[in-house]
């Protein structure tokens, strides 16, 4: 499997700052994309892309850095930078899940350390989301009856109890159960339970995600 190159997004309304940051980030071996506003970033951001972090200016024309953070929710790690930051803004940013809040000007070493921490978190998030997407694709292969069987099986029902609940022959339930195990790529009941729980978690995440 080809490793996905992490991306560093930079949102800052100062063109000189964007250029300087992009140059530093590229020279340090990272991929980088820059944006002059939060609105431009939202238009182009793909939440289903590879692992990435966001280097975000607090004070922006139009949508502010904190407002953008609120819209992105848990989609990617955010490093705030500000020359006008105050304690209240820093607290709000960290409560919102920011990985760092850096005052401008920031030294190269401090910034790059913050980027690496954020990207490490991004890699974990990407791996987690990739796993959930794989599990969801398995669930989609199940027929409606197989999903019913899986729901009851992971709830602890025996085959004869599932048969009684669904009004089917126990032999038929055994066939459905075997197909569920095969399609979900589960080697044991315990693994099927784990997969079902993650599939449910993925559905809940999709339902509550704040990014649009």
Feature map (PLM): residue ranges:
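Acidic, metal-coordinating helix/loop segments flanking the phosphotransfer/catalytic sites
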Residues: 2, 34-53
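Conserved acidic segment of CheY-like receiver
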Residues: 4-17, 21-25, 38, 54, ...
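Basic, Lys/Arg-enriched C-terminal extension of HTH/homeodomain DNA-binding domains
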Residues: 181-212
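Active-site residues of response regulator receiver
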Residues: 57, 82
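Acidic catalytic/metal-coordinating carboxylates
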Residues: 36-37, 61-70, 85
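C-terminal output helix
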Residues: 86-89, 102-115, 161, 165
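Recognition helix of helix-turn-helix DNA-binding domains
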Residues: 158-191
């Amino acid at each position: 499997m080809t490793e996905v190159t992490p991306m560093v997004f930079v949102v800052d309304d100062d063109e000189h700052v964007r250029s300087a940051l992009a140059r530093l980030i590229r020279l340090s071996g990272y991929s980088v994309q820059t944006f002059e506003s939060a609105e431009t970033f939202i238009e182009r951001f793909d939440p289903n892309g590879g692992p990435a972090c966001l280097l975000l200016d607090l004070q922006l024309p139009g949508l502010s850095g904190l407002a953008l953070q609120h819209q992105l929710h848990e989609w990617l790690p955010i490093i705030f930078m500000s020359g006008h930051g105050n304690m209240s803004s820093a607290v709000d940013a960290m409560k919102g899940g920011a990985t760092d809040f850096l005052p401008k000007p920031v030294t190269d070493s401090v910034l790059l350390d913050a980027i690496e921490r954020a990207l490490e978190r991004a890699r974990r998030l990407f791996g987690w989301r990739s796993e959930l997407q794989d599990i969801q694709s398995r669930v989609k292969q199940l027929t409606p009856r197989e999903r019913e069987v899986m729901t009851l099986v992971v709830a602890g029902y025996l085959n004869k109890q599932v048969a009684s609940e669904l009004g089917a022959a126990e032999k038929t339930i055994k066939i459905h159960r075997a197909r569920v195990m095969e399609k979900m790529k589960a080697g044991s009941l315990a693994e099927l339970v784990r997969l079902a729980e993650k599939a449910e978690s993925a559905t809940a995440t999709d339902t509550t995600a704040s990014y649009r």
